Amino acid sequence: MENMNVFQLNIGLNNNPYTFEKITEALVVTFEGEIVGTREHMGEYEGRPEPTLVAKIVTEMDSESLRVFTTMMAMKFTQECIGMKVNEEGTLVYNPDFKGEQYTFDAEYFIEF
């Protein structure tokens, strides 16, 4: 189990055409690792409450591959952005179609698993 990365995601459920269960299924299929768990948490986006899927995945995939997959998920799940952490490094991955102001990752707003 060398070279394993702990990958965490925050995926908003408002404006998302997929349910919590369907997103969890998509994560199982997408990632070449084991989903340690998913849970729903009431988060916040732009000052408004938003139910959020919080996922923790253990995977051999590298950071760049995880970023590419997260970009694809932002598009599939109609998200402006998805917060992600690989080990202790966090970032916001924006949907390429999003034209608004892009923020930088702030650990204070990231929901840990």
Language-model features: where?
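Short, intrinsically disordered low-complexity segments
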Residues: 30-72, 76
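Short, low-order "capping/linker" segments at domain edges
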Residues: 48-52, 91-113
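Generic low-polarity alpha-helical segments
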Residues: 23, 70, 82-83
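N-terminal, charge-rich interaction modules
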Residues: 1-36, 44-46, 113
